[in-house]
Each structure stands twice: as structure tokens, then as C-alpha cells.
């Protein structure tokens, strides 16, 4: 079992949590919605294979108003007509910031996303994506466990 990075250096973890709160505050102030931010977090966590963050942010996305169907179809968002132009833009940012290095295609996606979102919300989306990628890596390296939950979202064990 890995060492929990957050427990080994709680002062660094506290700084990371403050950073995350600052990113969230800045994103909301610049026009990104909670729903959009959570879509970024879930999609990046899917791409990174971070079970702990997927569990957390899928719940938070539902609390923010994202439907279960939107979450279920997220891996195939490009193939559905369900997602709004803004949702598609933030999902493109999530993917470009997570799957590195940037390619010609991801650069084109970022350019299109910036056009849709405007500079402030676009930069906010990039910060949200960068932050969740940090937390994905912390959770993956720490092997943070996912606890079973019932239909009501409460832990069952």
C-alpha cells in the first residue's frame, strides 16, 4: 500500500486544498458554473483513471445539477447531441489539459473552446483542469480508497 501523501505532509495538503478553493472561487467569478467545473473534473478523472476523484466528483456533479445520463455519456460526449456548446467547450479543455502533449487537434479544440467561452471563462476552465489533474495524481499515488455507497450516496461499509 502506498503512503497517503495528504497524511504524510498535511501542511502541503492544506495548501493544495486552499489552492483548489481559490481555483473554484476564481472560476465562478469568471463565469464558469459549478456544473461546468464538475464536468471538467469528472472527465479528467476518467481519462486519468482516478477512482477516488471519479467517485467524489460524480457525486458533486449530481449535486450541482448534472444529470446521471450526462455523466453516463461523458466518455462519448463528442458523439452525442446532448451537451451544450459551452459544455462541449469545457470538455475539450478537460481533455486537452489531461492528455498531453498538445496535438494539432487539441490546439484546435482549445482555440474553439476559447472562442465559445471567452478569455476569462476559458482561463478558468484551464485552471480547473490543471487543478483536478494535480489531485488525480495525488489520489492515484496515494491509492486513496473508494468506499462502497448505496443508492442514497451514503457509505455502506
Regions found by a protein language model. Give the residues of each.
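Hydrophobic alpha-helical segments
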Residues: 1-157
Amino acid at each position: 500500500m502506498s503512503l497517503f501523501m495528504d497524511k504524510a505532509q498535511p501542511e502541503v495538503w492544506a495548501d493544495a486544498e486552499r489552492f483548489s478553493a481559490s481555483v473554484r472561487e476564481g472560476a465562478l467569478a469568471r463565469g464558469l458554473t459549478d456544473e461546468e467545473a464538475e464536468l471538467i473534473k469528472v472527465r479528467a478523472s476518467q481519462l486519468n483513471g482516478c477512482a477516488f476523484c471519479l467517485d467524489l466528483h460524480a457525486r458533486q456533479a449530481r449535486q450541482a445539477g448534472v444529470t446521471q445520463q450526462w455523466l453516463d455519456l461523458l466518455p462519448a460526449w463528442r458523439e452525442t447531441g446532448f451537451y451544450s456548446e459551452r459544455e462541449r467547450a469545457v470538455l475539450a479543455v478537460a481533455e486537452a489539459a489531461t492528455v498531453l502533449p498538445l496535438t494539432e487537434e487539441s490546439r484546435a479544440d482549445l482555440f474553439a473552446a476559447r472562442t465559445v467561452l471567452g478569455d476569462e471563462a476559458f482561463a478558468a476552465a484551464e485552471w480547473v483542469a490543471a487543478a483536478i489533474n494535480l489531485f488525480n495524481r495525488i489520489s492515484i499515488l496515494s491509492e486513496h480508497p473508494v468506499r462502497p455507497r448505496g443508492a442514497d450516496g451514503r457509505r455502506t461499509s
